[in-house]
């Protein structure tokens, strides 16, 4: 219940006291119900209230009825204004939602639009020349307009990586082979040195034995 509706009820109660008649809440609600009845026009309302009050008091109720109609008209006007405001706000909210949805759809479309087509003619020429120079199979750009490598270039990169990897493996294999060869050469040299030492030791042993034999022969002669 609005503030003005409460004030109207208070006015009815006060007026009934002035009429020196029943001012109970039941009577107040009854009169308030008549004045609020949207199915009746103002004349019908005045007639109904006047007839009711005539059964309760002999005092003239014309001014009272007119004042109630004026106050009730203000209540109706306030409600209509409030409803119009609600409808206006609702319409604005709906328009805002539609606008936001439309803008969102536009943003999505712009997001997936190829930036290449937004370039100037000169920018397109430069881009095409770049694509041709580096042998791209197809032109493609991301959302920022940067070139995305085609499958051909990706494959070439993979092949280059494989070649580099293969070269690395070959270099490792050569290094290992060289190390093994160096070990074999070292072992061979060490073996030759050992053979030479053994040979020299054997020759020395033979010389010593020959020397001993010679000494023995000399002793026998003596």
Curated annotation (Swiss-Prot):
The lineage of its organism: Eukaryota, Amoebozoa, Evosea, Eumycetozoa, Dictyostelia. This is Coiled-coil domain-containing protein 43 homolog. Residues 112-126, 175-212 have a biased composition (Basic and acidic residues). It comes from Dictyostelium discoideum (Social amoeba). Residues 80-111, 168-222 form a coiled coil. Residues 102-126, 159-222 are annotated as: Disordered. Residues 213-222 have a biased composition (Basic residues). Belongs to the CCDC43 family. Keywords: Coiled coil.
